[in-house]
């Protein structure tokens, strides 16, 4: 528990400090591929109008905005993040969107009732949570039976050529970007470590299943440097019996 608390405090400091530069840093580090990946994920999701979505670790609100457009004016999107400064940037970006609400909170203790949302998403945020499985179980809890969960996250490439490029990128290129945009060594080292140490797609799929999700499928992007995990909460077949 002590390690989790220290980890959580470190991550909070990092994102509090990097909030105003986060969008630009994300674009540069991913060569703007995160936008392409998110569009493909949204296409796979097929979000229905008038539904309720939760964006966990919403950060500055990029995926929240995409969900807002997808659910339409009759739908609702809630974004939650533990960094107040990241949320402030997100609130500026979503100020004109009446179907969006951003709240401060913890991914491991979501402040919502059971079975509240049709969709729950998390984009490039799970790697920053101290306990992945606890967060996934919380996402399952607040998801409606039959609802969809989607995670878009960095992953470990499996193709040999991409594995070599990935290793070189993290060893030589990532530190340069980090030093340019981060305020301290702690910040860019965390960006490196959290990404490089994140589980591969098959291990993460097992975590999704352990958290209670079914029919989990995985889609890799750009040689496996990122991956989508999409699953469902089992339907409640006891109703009406």
UniProtKB/Swiss-Prot annotation:
Biological process, per Gene Ontology: menaquinone biosynthetic process; methylation
Transferase in keyword set: yes
Binding residues annotated for S-adenosyl-L-methionine, in chain numbering: 60, 81, 106-107
PROSITE patterns named in the record: SAM_MT_UBIE, UBIE_1, UBIE_2
Catalytic activity: a 2-demethylmenaquinol + S-adenosyl-L-methionine = a menaquinol + S-adenosyl-L-homocysteine + H(+)
First-level EC class: transferase
Name this protein carries in UniProt: Demethylmenaquinone methyltransferase
Gene, per the UniProt record: menG
């Amino acid at each position: 528990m002590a390690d989790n608390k220290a980890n959580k405090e470190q991550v909070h400091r990092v994102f509090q400090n990097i909030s105003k530069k986060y969008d630009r840093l994300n674009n540069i580090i991913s060569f703007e591929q995160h936008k392409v990946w998110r569009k493909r994920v949204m296409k796979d999701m097929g979000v229905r109008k008038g539904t309720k979505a939760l964006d966990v670790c919403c950060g500055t609100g990029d995926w929240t905005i995409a969900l807002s457009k997808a659910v339409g004016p009759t739908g609702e999107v809630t974004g939650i993040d533990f960094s107040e400064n990241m949320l402030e940037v997100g609130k500026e970006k979503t100020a004109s969107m009446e179907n969006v609400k951003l709240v401060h909170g913890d991914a491991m203790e979501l402040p919502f009732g059971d079975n509240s949302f049709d969709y729950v998403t998390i984009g490039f945020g799970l790697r920053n949570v101290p306990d992945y499985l606890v967060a996934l179980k919380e996402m399952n809890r607040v998801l409606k039976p039959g609802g969809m969960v989607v995670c878009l996250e960095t992953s470990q490439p499996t193709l040999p050529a991409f594995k070599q490029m990935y290793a070189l990128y993290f060893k030589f290129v990532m530190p340069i970007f980090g030093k340019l945009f981060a305020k301290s060594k702690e910040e860019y080292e965390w960006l490196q470590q959290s990404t490089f140490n994140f589980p591969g797609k098959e291990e993460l799929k097992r975590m999704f299943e352990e958290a209670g999700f079914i029919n989990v499928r995985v889609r890799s992007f750009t040689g496996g440097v990122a991956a989508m995990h999409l699953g469902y909460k089992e339907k409640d077949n006891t109703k009406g019996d």
